[in-house]
């Protein structure tokens, strides 16, 4: 199992959600986050070349899927979240050792 | 390290008055370090100045962005100064006032005397002290251009953008100014990006020359490094041993692009016909019964052809790849699923045939092959490539034979690459025999061959029949290599542009369908039908859906990348990958390496048609082209130096470089 974490533009949430649901994803966690990337998070400039680092509002989506679905999920995410402009976000993929559903105690794939 | 300036996947699209769009620049990717001197060359209208304008901030990219020191460029700024061809001086101000205008605005925080000093210094830098109080009308062209340069430098920019700065000057003035510019750049350490038409000028001034292809959808065709040491002098650079070779390469590039432009005029027509329905709805498409014919089967069975208006698509099962090539040549087939190198091979007329220009607008699958050896090698303990080499060396009088499907197939090229990287010469130490894929296993059983490299299900078939074992899959050689592509005659694509677009769209959707593992069981059942692969799902399933059994001690494991149809931008018809195929075909002496490889690759591999289909489907069409490729042995292929790459191999045949003019021959035919 893998965890796919995507940092996306807030206004892209609906598109991403629809794309993932259509791809057969049954659950996701969304949180509001702030951060910066290569852009140092801002485009303002004060007098010449003085810059500050600012945090920008983004959304983080977390999904846990079977290994076989990762590529497909990533492709759907990219298609849906992309505008082509700088600041579209990033996707991080990491392994998940185990999943437990609290209500039933089911484990791993059944618990997703 | 972060580059000083990064042009990050930039597209520039202009809307047309008739509602259409003109894609001027497509997917430009370039990293520039501080203090570097870059020249942009290319034919008029290819988008050089547009690119420069986007760096200056006067224009904005439609997609992607330009990043300087970690910040996106969104507007013009004093740290990026532009020198235009037409000087752009204010005629009512003197030289000094023109420069002062810039300095007083940008450096207004400095005390007055310092500003004055900067102005004087810059006038002195371009040697115009005596003319400081003249107006532009009283100056010669060269002097005016020097004022423009002084003005640009006076604000202490980090980047100097030069748009054909010496275009309007006479040769002598130009020469002097070039030398002055080099000195100034050397002193100030400013990064320069210059647009020029003059190849000698580009060579004299630049560290790297970036050559753009002819638009529409202009992109970086080739990047040349200029290794001439600095300081350079106009009269001395010509003596540098690489000067004429580099100059020749640039002129050659421009000539290739000129030819490409004439051909491009035809394909423009393609876009204009887009919305008017299809020209042809009955297609005969050739395929070979293999697991990776799945996209064609899905497109037919799941109605993707129908959805895009292709109502009568006939999938023609062919006995061999040669039959597919013949079918295309004889026009019996409208198009076919081909091994990745076949469109290039047909275009070049490989094997002494007449060149037949082909088009590949999409890759239909990646990976999916394996090298299977006869069980007798397993009994002799051959587990690795090195074992195989030792085993073959033991019996020099006995030559083993391996089967491959077509000279232009990835199976052949990867098998040869793999053997050669283990110091086995595929032409001398071993015998390669050409056989159609469905006949591999029976030949292995009959003892005609000792192994083969082929697509599934034939490796799994040999494993399940206990005839052989898989010593390597292509995941071990080049994970993600292009495998099957769509191949159409160029003449056909030009005649039926809307049909071609519909076909690509249908197949793209089919590819996406194939890569969803929830659909794999269903596809498996289709593939097993007699009109398609026609074997039991037991043989097709390994790798495609279930664990892949190599038939050795190793436990069968899930290879999720084994059949890629859509994910990881599988369908993008990358030019760099096409060029890699050309290098390997030349390496083994199948073809003369085309001197005009840029032209050949641009004609055959068509990301523009792919992009068009993606845009119609609402998919992102972006993928970096012009990237390096490296295989399992770690040797890096850079698309700027294909010949150097071939020569770095220890084992290769004699390389001939010839110009292959596909059009002239084409005209004779008609």
UniProtKB/Swiss-Prot annotation, chain A:
Q: Name one GO biological process term.
A: regulation of nitrogen utilization
- Report the InterPro entries cross-referenced here: N-reg_PII (IPR002187), N-reg_PII-like_a/b (IPR011322), N-reg_PII/ATP_PRibTrfase_C (IPR015867), N-reg_PII_CS (IPR017918), N-reg_PII_urydylation_site (IPR002332)
Chain positions found as O-UMP-tyrosine = 51
Keywords for the protein's UniProt record, in alphabetical order: Nucleotide-binding, Phosphoprotein, Transcription, Transcription regulation
Entry keyword annotation includes Transcription: yes
Q: How is it modified after translation?
A: Phosphorylation dependent on the nitrogen source and spectral light quality.
Q: Name one GO molecular function term.
A: enzyme regulator activity
The modified positions for Phosphoserine read 49
- SUPFAM superfamilies in the record: GlnB-like (SSF54913)
Per the record, its GO cellular-component terms are: cytosol
**So where does this one cross the membrane?**
none
Outline the subunit composition: Homotrimer.
The record's PANTHER family line, in alphabetical order, gives: NITROGEN REGULATORY PROTEIN P-II (PTHR30115), NITROGEN REGULATORY PROTEIN P-II HOMOLOG (PTHR30115:SF11)
- Protein family according to the UniProt entry: Belongs to the P(II) protein family.
According to its UniProt entry, what is the function of this protein? P-II indirectly controls the transcription of the GS gene (glnA). P-II prevents NR-II-catalyzed conversion of NR-I to NR-I-phosphate, the transcriptional activator of glnA. When P-II is phosphorylated, these events are reversed. In nitrogen-limiting conditions, when the ratio of Gln to 2-ketoglutarate decreases, P-II is phosphorylated which allows the deadenylation of glutamine synthetase (GS), thus activating the enzyme.
Name the UniProt record assigns to this protein: Nitrogen regulatory protein P-II
Q: Which organism is it from?
A: Synechocystis sp. (strain ATCC 27184 / PCC 6803 / Kazusa)
Gene name of the record: glnB
From Swiss-Prot, chain B:
UniProt KW Repeat keyword:
no
Q: Where in the cell is it found?
A: Cell inner membrane
Q: Which domain of life is it from?
A: Bacteria
> Single GO cellular component annotation?
plasma membrane
* Transmembrane segment boundaries: none
Q: What is its EC number?
A: 7.3.2.4
Q: Where does ATP bind?
A: 42-49
What are the boundaries of the region NrtA-like? 279-670
Q: Which residues form the ABC transporter domain?
A: 5-239
Primary location group: membrane
How would you describe this protein's topology in the membrane?
A: Peripheral membrane protein
Keywords on this record?
ATP-binding, Cell inner membrane, Cell membrane, Ion transport, Membrane, Nitrate assimilation, Nucleotide-binding, Translocase, Transport
Q: What is known of its domains?
A: Contains an ATP-binding N-terminal domain and a NrtA-like C-terminal domain, which are connected by a segment containing an abundance of glutamine, alanine and positively charged amino acids. The N-terminal domain is required for activity and the C-terminal domain is involved in regulation of the activity.
Subunit-structure text: The complex is composed of two ATP-binding proteins (NrtC and NrtD), two transmembrane proteins (NrtB) and a solute-binding protein (NrtA).
Q: What is this protein called?
A: Nitrate import ATP-binding protein NrtC
Organism lineage reads as:
Bacteria, Bacillati, Cyanobacteriota, Cyanophyceae, Synechococcales
Q: Which gene encodes it?
A: nrtC
């Amino acid at each position: 199992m893998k965890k796919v974490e995507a940092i996306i533009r807030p206004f892209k949430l609906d598109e991403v959600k629809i794309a993932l649901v259509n791809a057969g994803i049954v659950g996701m966690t969304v949180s509001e986050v702030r951060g910066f990337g290569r852009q140092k998070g801002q485009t303002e400039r004060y007098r010449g070349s003085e810059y500050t680092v600012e945090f920008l509002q983004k959304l983080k989506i977390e999904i846990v899927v079977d290994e076989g679905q990762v590529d497909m999920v990533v492709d759907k995410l990219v298609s849906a979240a992309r505008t082509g402009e700088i600041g579209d976000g990033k996707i991080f993929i990491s392994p998940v050792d185990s999943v437990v559903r609290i209500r039933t105690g089911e484990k791993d794939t059944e618990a997703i | 390290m972060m580059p000083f300036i990064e042009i990050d996947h930039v597209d520039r699209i202009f809307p047309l008055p008739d509602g259409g769009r003109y894609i001027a620049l497509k997917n430009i990717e370039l990293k520039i370090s501080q203090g570097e001197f870059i020249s942009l060359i290319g034919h008029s209208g290819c988008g050089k100045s547009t690119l420069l304008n986007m760096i200056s901030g006067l224009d904005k990219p439609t997609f992607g962005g330009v990043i300087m020191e970690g910040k996106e460029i969104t507007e013009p700024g004093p740290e990026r100064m532009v020198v235009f061809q037409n000087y752009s001086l204010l005629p009512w101000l003197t030289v000094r006032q023109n420069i002062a205008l810039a300095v007083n605005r940008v450096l207004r925080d400095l005390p007055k005397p310092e500003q004055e000093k900067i102005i004087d210094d810059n006038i002195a830098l371009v040697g115009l002290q005596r003319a400081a109080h003249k107006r532009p009308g009283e100056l010669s062209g060269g002097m005016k251009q020097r004022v423009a340069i002084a003005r640009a430098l006076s604000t202490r920019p980090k980047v100097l953008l030069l748009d054909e700065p010496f275009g309007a000057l006479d040769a002598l003035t130009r020469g002097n100014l070039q030398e002055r510019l080099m000195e100034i750049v050397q002193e100030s350490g400013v990064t320069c990006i210059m647009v020029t038409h003059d190849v000698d000028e580009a060579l004299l001034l630049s560290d790297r020359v970036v050559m753009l292809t002819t638009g529409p959808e202009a992109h970086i065709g080739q990047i040349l490094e200029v290794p001439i040491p600095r300081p350079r002098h106009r009269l001395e650079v010509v003596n540098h041993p690489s000067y004429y070779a580099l100059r020749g390469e640039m002129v050659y590039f421009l000539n290739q692009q000129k030819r490409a432009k004439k051909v491009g005029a035809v394909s423009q027509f393609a876009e204009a016909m887009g919305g008017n329905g299809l020209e042809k709805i009955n297609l005969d498409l050739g395929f070979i019964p293999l697991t990776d014919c799945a996209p064609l089967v899905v497109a037919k069975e799941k109605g993707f052809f129908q959805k895009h208006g292709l109502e009568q698509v006939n999938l023609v099962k062919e006995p061999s790849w040669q039959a597919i090539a013949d079918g295309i040549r004889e026009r019996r087939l409208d198009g076919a699923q081909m091994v990745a190198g076949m469109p290039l091979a047909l275009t070049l007329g490989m094997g002494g045939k007449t060149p037949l220009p082909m088009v590949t607008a999409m890759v239909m699958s990646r990976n999916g092959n394996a090298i299977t050896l006869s069980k007798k090698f397993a009994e002799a303990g051959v587990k690795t490539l090195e074992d195989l080499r030792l085993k073959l060396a033991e019996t020099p009088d006995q030559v083993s034979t391996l089967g491959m499907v077509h000279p232009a197939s990835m199976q052949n090229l990867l098998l040869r690459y793999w053997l050669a990287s283990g110091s086995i010469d595929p032409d001398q130490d071993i015998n390669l025999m050409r056989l159609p894929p469905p006949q591999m296993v029976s030949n292995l059983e009959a003892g005609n061959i000792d192994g083969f490299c082929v697509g599934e299900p034939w490796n799994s078939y040999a494993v399940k029949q206990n005839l052989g074992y898989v010593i390597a899959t292509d995941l071990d050689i080049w994970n993600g290599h292009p495998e099957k592509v769509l191949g159409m005659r160029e003449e056909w694509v030009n005649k039926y542009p809307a049909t071609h677009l519909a076909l690509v769209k249908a197949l793209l959707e089919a590819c996406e369908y194939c890569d969803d593992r929830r659909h794999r069981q269903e596809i498996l059942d289709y593939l097993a039908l007699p009109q398609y692969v026609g074997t039991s799902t037991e043989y097709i399933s390994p790798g495609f859906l279930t664990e892949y059994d190599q038939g050795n001690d190793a436990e069968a494991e899930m290879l999720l990348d084994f059949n890629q149809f859509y994910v990881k931008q599988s369908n993008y018809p990358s030019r760099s990958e096409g060029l890699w195929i050309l290098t390997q075909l030349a390496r083994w002496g199948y073809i003369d390496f085309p001197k005009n490889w840029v032209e050949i690759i641009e004609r055959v591999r068509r990301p523009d048609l792919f992009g068009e289909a993606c845009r119609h489907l609402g998919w992102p069409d972006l993928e970096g082209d012009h990237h390096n490729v490296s295989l399992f042995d770690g040797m890096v292929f850079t698309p700027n130096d294909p010949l150097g790459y071939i020569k770095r191999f220890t084992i290769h045949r004699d390389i001939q470089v010839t110009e292959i003019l596909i059009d002239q021959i084409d005209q004779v035919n008609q």
